Amino acid sequence: MKFMKKIIISVSALFAFGAAMMGQNLDPTVEVSRVYEGKLIEVHKPALEMSVPDTLHKFDLGFDYWVFDNPYKGSYEFKPYVMEMRPSSVQRHKNTFFLQAGAGYTVHPTLDLLWSPIKKGAFSMDVYANHRSYIGEYRAIEQIPAWDGYDLMSKAGIDFGYDWQKADFDFGASYFGIADKDYRRDRMFNAVDAYVSLKSKSLWSKKFIYNIDLAYRFAEDAAVSKMNIHDLSLDASFGQGSKKGSRILFDLGMDMSAYSGALESSAARFYVVPHYVYTKGILSLDLGVRVSVVKASGDAFGNMNQIVYPDVRMDLALVPDALKMYLNVGGGDKLQTYSSLIEKNHHIDLSYGLAGNGSLMGVTVERVSAVLGFEGRISSHFSYNLRTGYVNYKSAPLDAVGSVGCQYVPMLGYSPYQKAFTALDWNMAFQSVRFDGSVVYNLAWGIENADFIGLSAVEGDAAFAYSWNSRINAGVDCNFASGRSSAAGFKVPGYADLGVFGEYVFNRKISLWLRGGNLLNMEIQRNLLFAEKGINFTAGICLNL
């Protein structure tokens, strides 16, 4: 109770600070403070002009924009090429109606819907919906026999926006739901989300700039037993600009999660980042220090928080508009909330908590990370991002395997470890041909528990697409990962999810599409001990009215 009172007092103080900022006679100019605007290059990733509005990328389950890669990745982060189709900006008009729907065998029904009924002057409104699911047989793995189940995910919401001359104000609400059945239990997860955002447009000026993002989720999970969830986040940035290309900025915020029912617990993270931003010529510097504190009821996380972390970025335009070198040195922490874990793996429930290593919900603590990279392009047809780095985790989530009787069960725990990596992203695009992808090499060591499953040494994806006369679009893609294993000897096989896709465009408003997946019929365990069975094909229609 005392812990919750402290959280409420801290949240009230943050809201009061935000209200004070709003009450000043300021130009309504807001922007995310970590955006760097200088004379550095922007490497754009050209794409074939397909037929999905950018707004539909609200359906992405989240990206981690930290310096370090997310150490715990679920099965929903890879999105096949057909699901990534997007139009050029000229395809959007005042009143947009977009629908993409498909079904096939095995049963993978999909639905994307966007309706923009109001775009008058500065005001806009978008209504959207999304559905992804699998219904059918799952493969037999180890001592687990084949079984029939389903995994359904739906999202629907409404967004409102107001575009001032120097600021953007957005707010909205949405529903997010998961229903799944596996060999252990059934689950129904329902969540209602709401957010408010205020962002300035003018970055490099003498004016006071600020940014406020507020989000709240209420969720109810009925899996092993019923649990209520409250997630709240507040992020604010502010600072004084300067025409000389430098300024001092402050980022601050909090994340809080509270649980009742099957689990009585709460946790919160508070952070502040003062940093100095300087740009001159080809050089851009962002020198900051992150101060962050994580607290949990009953001291559930123990002494996991480092409190002070580096937060430094340097960009150097070696060849203006062609080659940029960057260096990031960072660190930080992040709450692994019940909601965020479920969105990465729909099968997770409270039974996943690994005995002796804390509860299912924990905190990722990155002591320090360093990334050196080169981002550039060769002519207007080829762009790339090559980087190498090192990460030292004090605590990070990892898959693990336990047993109940003679049957394996999936689990999740937290461990310190270190990682070195090298990664390459590339895109080659001509008028009718596109080839892009990414590949990462990981070398991890220092994982403490023998039951933890390590990282894949190599993972990535690639896609090749051809557009014939803007009428037929076709290609092949592949998402792949090498095998993983634990020190105790449990092995997760590697895989290559080979797919083909095609689209026939009747006109600007209607097209038909087809996708085939897992053509090599491999055992793909993106979620530990869960693998959908067999080759699959999905066909559908796309309307853009």
Regions found by a protein language model. Give the residues of each.
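Hydrophobic, lipid-facing positions within transmembrane beta-strands of outer-membrane proteins
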Residues: N95, P109-L113, L152-I158, N190-V196, ...
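Flexible loop and strand-edge segments within Gram-negative outer membrane beta-barrel domains
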Residues: Y134-D159, F169-I209, D213-D231, G261
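N-terminal periplasmic/intermembrane-space "pro-region" immediately following the signal or transit peptide
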Residues: M22-S89
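Transmembrane beta-barrel strands of outer-membrane/channel proteins
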Residues: A101-A103, V127-H131, F171-G177, I212-F218, ...
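Outer-membrane beta-barrel translocator/receptor signature
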Residues: F78-M83, V90-L99, A103-I141, D148-A156, ...
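Exposed, low-structure sequence patches enriched in small/polar residues
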Residues: S284, K295-Y309, R313-L545
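Surface-exposed extracellular loop regions of Gram-negative outer-membrane beta-barrel proteins
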Residues: K119-R139, R247-D251, D255, S265-S297, ...
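Solvent-exposed loop/turn segments connecting transmembrane beta-strands
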Residues: Q100-D112, G121, D148-D151, D221-I229, ...
